[in-house]
Amino acid sequence: MSKVSGSNGGDSKNTLYCSFCGKSQHEVRKLIAGPTVFICDECVELCMDIIREENKTSMVKSREGVPTPQDIIKILDEYVIGQKQAKKILSVAVHNHYKRLAHASKNGDVELAKSNIMLVGPTGCGKTYLAQTLARIIDVPFTMADATTLTEAGYVGEDVENIILKLLQAADYNVERAQRGIVYIDEVDKISRKSDNPSITRDVSGEGVQQALLKIMEGTVASVPPQGGRKHPQQEFLQVDTTNILFICGGAFAGLDKIISARGEKTSIGFGATVKAEDDRRVGEVLRELEPEDLVKFGLIPEFIGRLPVLATLEDLDEDALIQILSEPKNALVKQYQRLFEMEDVELTFHEDALREIARRAITRKTGARGLRSIMEKILLDTMFELPTLEGVREVVISNDVVSGVARPLYIYADRQEEKANVSA
């Protein structure tokens, strides 16, 4: 027991003692009471030292174990189809970034600058998914922000500091871990300057946001309110150094291919003028020739582009790539739905031509890989609605006609060789 009665006088009659070190309440500054135990401030401090030391050790281990670019690409290949050049650029940039952090104290006179990354590519080509997978490989906190919701401080909308707050939340409020995390800012093409001409009205969601992002991307100590900025003005702020946070920005940049195609082309007028042939290359092929000056013409300010020295362009996905995405990666959509059907003890089978038709529809919609799930949901909706109440179904087969909407899925029953085609008229 921590509470001891003594016979040395009135003072020691109800003296309390620390259950861990045995010191009395008179020998320590504070004694914290639990249901049946007490702990002194010195023991609490000792426990904190032990925890800090363990955290430091685990940090050192993670820093020393930076995966090589080849290792990173190998894991990316398991989850992301295609985009070989973009994967190579990203794996080298991420490896160098965390290698720089691992050897930060050994650099001597040479200080290595941070290389943030800009991903440019059509909608649904895998920009966001690449960033998420990278964070998982390196095992660091990751957060995603939508640039369209951001505004300058003092205006309605989200402050840029809220991005750091989300990262801190992803790190369970561990500031050390958050300071080594990855932030992905999506839709940066939507914060481009509204026009080349200076305007009387302030552009708070365009150039203003770019200006606000400059500091946190370059490196600053951000004061982050734990409960979100504007609703609780009296709360204490957490200090987060953004110097070692890796920022990855992404956007579709619709129309950027036209700016690239127009660059360097000489125009002439009159009867002797050469008729300019239309560029019939795919968007992804044109984007390979991207230069920083093209992004300036698009509407990003030079200072913002300067904070993103690594440029990686992604190609639009063709039919074959979309079929691979449907069936090959570890968490491919087909495998996900097959797992769902397995929970009902039913096997789900897709014909090859059905997958091809799904890919064609995604290309027609111009939604890339992102549109595949909505197409799959529409195809399988009725089946998933009926299946839990049907008895004896062992297999569901999806053909090209099912995807085209001219037939219902084929149900194969186990107890009899009966097939229910449900072909619609």
UniProtKB/Swiss-Prot annotation:
**Molecular-function GO term, any one:** ATP hydrolysis activity
The UniProt record gives the binding positions of Zn(2+) as: C18, C21, C40, C43
Q: Identify the keywords attached in UniProt to this record, alphabetized.
A: ATP-binding, Chaperone, Metal-binding, Nucleotide-binding, Zinc
* Domain ClpX-type ZB span(s) in chain numbering: 6-59
State the PROSITE patterns in the record: CLPX_ZB (PS51902)
Residues at which ATP binds: P122, T123, G124, C125, G126, K127, T128, Y129
Q: Name one GO cellular component term.
A: HslUV protease complex
InterPro entries assigned to the protein according to its UniProt record, in alphabetical order: AAA+_ATPase (IPR003593), ATP-dep_Clp_protease_ClpX (IPR050052), ATPase_AAA_core (IPR003959), Clp_ATPase_C (IPR019489), Clp_protease_ATP-bd_su_ClpX (IPR004487), ClpX_bact (IPR046425), P-loop_NTPase (IPR027417), Znf_CppX_C4 (IPR010603)
For this entry, list what GO says about its biological process.
Answer: cell division; proteolysis involved in protein catabolic process
Outline the subunit composition. Component of the ClpX-ClpP complex. Forms a hexameric ring that, in the presence of ATP, binds to fourteen ClpP subunits assembled into a disk-like structure with a central cavity, resembling the structure of eukaryotic proteasomes.
The Swiss-Prot or TrEMBL record describes its family as follows: Belongs to the ClpX chaperone family.
Which PANTHER family does the UniProt record give?
Answer: ATP-DEPENDENT CLP PROTEASE ATP-BINDING SUBUNIT CLPX-LIKE, MITOCHONDRIAL, ATP-DEPENDENT CLP PROTEASE ATP-BINDING SUBUNIT CLPX-LIKE, MITOCHONDRIAL-RELATED
* Record function comment: ATP-dependent specificity component of the Clp protease. It directs the protease to specific substrates. Can perform chaperone functions in the absence of ClpP.
Protein name, as recorded: ATP-dependent Clp protease ATP-binding subunit ClpX
